[in-house]
Amino acid sequence: AREALLAAQCPGRRRIAGEARQRFGAVHVLDPFEVSGHPSACYNPLDRLTPDSLDLGEDAASLTEALVMDPPGQVTEAHWNEEAKAILGGLIMFCVCHEDRDRRSLATVREYLTLPPEKLRALLELMQDSDAAGGLIARSANRFLGKADREAASVLSNAQRHTHFLDSPRIARCLARSDFAFADLRHRITSVFLVLPPNRMDAYSRWLRLLVSQALQDIARDAERPQSASEGRSERLKTPALFLLDEFAALGRLEAVERAMGLMAGYGLQLWPILQDMSQLKDLYGERAGTFIANAGVQQVFGVNDFETAKWLSQMMGQETAGFQTDSFKPGDGPSFSN
């Protein structure tokens, strides 16, 4: 219990765990639909992006990876998704570099994407004149405006589809400011709960993806940050932060999670993904599903009810010869034994 925690859980279990975790440190409940009975905390992913950072392009790209879900096996969507990421990244960087601080949010980026055609074109032409972010903003606008009208319309439609969840006033409010930093999970016993009711999971799973991805990015970057002479080793927790991903399948395929399974142990992070069966993992990660199994320190299995998972579990356990003895008795005869 004395470790930092990030949990994507259903409301009932969160309420029980959250009350217990308050004994150890700060508890932040991000609950846009207010099903936990407590006011929701907020986290704005754009708050950690700074206009003069050399990593601004990379940071914007990590956000677009979380926003744009690549369905497993749908190769035909790859081009449109990559182009959607490109224009989204440019709009995110423009927002960070040219908007007032109180306007720097994904809700503003969504506003850009849904502008009337003539106003959107004016915005893109303004981006072409920007020299911020090392010219990346201008390149993004040039890339989009250089497309034929039909292709550009398809790319824009795809970007709008992947950001549709940002139209929710509840989600926009929850992403408007930051009440904490995910890097806190490495420095003090902090608990973060991401709460979505089951009936909202399909529509708003990208919100979960976004926050889990940003948490992993922030922790990795904090771990790589050199400590100053005044900052002793005691400033960082000795026990790893636990990511309890109860709704793992709802996240979709997320490269940040895949990387974390192999690398995050060195960053003071422990992932605990929870799945209904092995098919969910294979559907999401294909041949890379083995990465999760190979890097797992412990595997827990309960109530196996499907053949594929039972077969996998049997193969993992291997074979062993078991010896046993049976006793039998018949009236009028002595006992008999067999091995």
Name what the model sees in each region:
Residues 34-36, 278, 306:
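Residue-level detector of flexible, active-site-proximal loop/helix-junction positions
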